[in-house]
């Protein structure tokens, strides 16, 4: 795993003029390597992590994925597959309730099929962009209210699934602390650790990484359950 990450950094990032050192002076300006920066973006859209040459004989499997852009995005495909192949339960952690359209369609489909869906999202006051009323207003400060509106609309339209227990939406809040968790757990056997926010920006614009843990024997499930309970201590369940 570490060798794959190091090889990717050395091959795709450090070798590029568009990734200058910032511990030397004078610092390069973007205009100095604008063409190289565009080429780097093109290269990263088709880049991927190397895989182990030897077949893994352990029960626990780990794979690395990279994603950038809407087309041919490996990480997005993995995320979509985790949603679509869930047979029993899907657990999601995201700081922003603003799913891209393909994932929202998959969520609704899972609920119609009677699958269990749990979503843990931060309260608007735990959002990175939240500005308390005492601070000057800015456009970026409106985002938490937008996400809150999208969340309440979703809860309202899916109320019957909330009432029958198939959908659990939890709002996290702990004093003035912020919430920036992200991750996916499918059927208690597949877990995605990622910086992907499950929002349109991460889906189509940002470069994102993900580590997919495949654990058919549920060897790490106890630790994941313990972590989930710690998180839910600061949550309230939305009822619509």
Question: Where in the sequence are the language-model features?
Answer:
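PLD-like (HKD) phosphodiesterase/transphosphatidyltransferase domain
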Residues: 39-125
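Extended, H/D-rich, highly charged conserved domains that either
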Residues: 1-43
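PLD/PLD-like phosphodiesterase catalytic module centered on the HKD motif
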Residues: 1, 86-89, 96-240
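Repeat-unit-sized solenoid/scaffold elements
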Residues: 25-61, 125-127, 191-209, 218
């Amino acid at each position: 795993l570490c060798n794959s990450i190091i090889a990717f950094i050395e091959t795709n990032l450090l070798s590029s003029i568009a990734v200058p050192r910032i511990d030397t002076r004078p610092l390069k300006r973007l205009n100095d390597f604008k063409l190289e920066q565009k080429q780097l973006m093109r290269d990263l859209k088709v880049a991927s992590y190397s895989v182990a040459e030897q077949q893994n004989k352990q029960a626990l499997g780990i794979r690395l994925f990279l994603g950038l852009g809407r087309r041919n995005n490996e990480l997005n495909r993995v995320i979509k597959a985790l949603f679509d192949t869930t047979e029993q339960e899907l657990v999601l952690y995201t700081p922003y309730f603003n799913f891209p359209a393909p994932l929202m369609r998959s969520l609704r489909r899972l609920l119609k099929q009677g699958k269990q869906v749990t979503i843990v999202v931060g309260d608007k006051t735990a959002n990175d962009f939240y500005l308390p009323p005492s601070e000057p207003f800015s456009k970026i400060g409106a985002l938490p209210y937008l996400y809150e509106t999208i969340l309440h609309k979703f809860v309202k339209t899916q109320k019957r699934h909330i009432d029958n227990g198939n959908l659990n939406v939890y709002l996290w809040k702990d004093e003035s602390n912020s919430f920036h968790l992200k991750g996916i757990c499918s059927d208690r056997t597949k877990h995605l650790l990622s910086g992907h926010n499950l929002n349109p920006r991460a889906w189509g614009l940002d470069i994102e990484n993900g580590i997919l843990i495949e654990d058919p024997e549920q060897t790490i499930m106890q630790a994941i359950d313990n972590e989930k309970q710690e998180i839910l201590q600061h949550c309230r369940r939305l009822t619509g």
